[in-house]
Design a protein with these regions (language model features):
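Conserved class I S-adenosyl-L-methionine
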Residues: 2-51, 150-178
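Class I SAM-dependent methyltransferase SAM/SAH-binding core
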Residues: 56, 62-110
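Class I S-adenosylmethionine-dependent transferase superfamily signal
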Residues: 69, 140-141
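A conserved beta-strand element that flanks and buttresses the S-adenosyl-L-methionine
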Residues: 122
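Short catalytic micro-motifs in class I SAM-dependent methyltransferases
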Residues: 125-126
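A short, conserved alpha-helix within the catalytic core of class I
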Residues: 129-140
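Conserved Class I S-adenosyl-L-methionine
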Residues: 183, 189-238
Length: 238
């Protein structure tokens, strides 16, 4: 069954994150687990105090962000709407023997949590949502958090990391997102950098290239590129 799906897998899903989350959680897992130096989670505590807090991690995916946050938090509640991703997250938490992390099925637009029920809300690159829905999940984060709400996004001009100039035919929504967070909701923001090391061209093509497009695959192969530099924007409101 798995072998048949791999054999029929397209060369790329061309920026269709909804397809990635629903049908290829194993590719997302390989992509998100490719090492970053320094990691986002190593840099976040320099911006927001995470220690000893109960954190709702919205859009938890396969659990990588939730388990990383558990190094600092008292408890992490990962919220994920895609069933395939949620299964992997729960398996990963069991495999890690983590007692601090639990996962709930739920949507960023209607969190399965009561008002003021957690100390802090995080959302690590909620890429699936169009800009017009950001207002709703920001309001949901503010509703359930007693303290800070922290979202990680991509600043204008950095979609896809340092290959943003290669990526074309993608709706550029970064400016809209920036306006919503900073102008409408008065979030503070700070940019951080991280280098993602894939080590081999084969690995970067089968993960990054599969996600972002055939043109990117051609570029990666031609340039023998194995590292992507990312610029992330941390938005937070206390």
């Amino acid at each position: 069954m798995i072998q048949g799906r791999i054999m029929s897998r397209p060369e790329s899903i061309e920026n269709r994150w909804d397809i990635l989350y629903r049908d290829y959680p194993e590719v997302y897992e390989a992509f998100s687990n490719t090492p970053y130096h320094p990691t986002v989670y190593e840099q976040l505590p320099g911006i927001i105090n995470l220690r000893g807090r109960c954190i709702a991690d919205v859009g938890a995916g396969t659990g990588t962000s939730s388990l990383a946050l558990a190094q600092y938090a008292r408890q992490v509640i990962g919220v994920e709407r895609e069933a395939a991703m949620l299964r992997q997250a729960r398996e990963k938490a069991r495999g890690a023997g983590s007692q601090r992390v639990t996962f709930l099925s739920g949507d960023a637009l209607a969190l399965p949590l009561a008002d003021d029920s957690v100390d802090l809300v995080t959302g690590i690159t909620l890429a699936l949502y169009p800009p017009e829905q950001y207002r709703n999940f920001i309001r949901e984060g503010l509703r359930v958090a007693k303290g800070p709400v922290v979202y990680l996004g991509i600043p204008p001009g950095w979609y896809g990391g340092d290959l943003y100039k290669v990526i074309e035919d993608v709706e550029k929504v970064d400016d809209k997102v920036d306006h919503i967070f900073i102008e409408e909701f008065q979030f503070s923001h700070q940019d951080i950098f991280s280098d993602q090391e894939y080590r081999t061209v084969g690995h970067i093509v089968s993960t990054y290239g599969f996600i972002f497009g055939k043109k990117e695959i051609e570029y990666l192969k031609r340039e023998n590129k194995t590292t992507i530099r990312w610029k992330f924007r941390v938005y937070w409101r206390e």
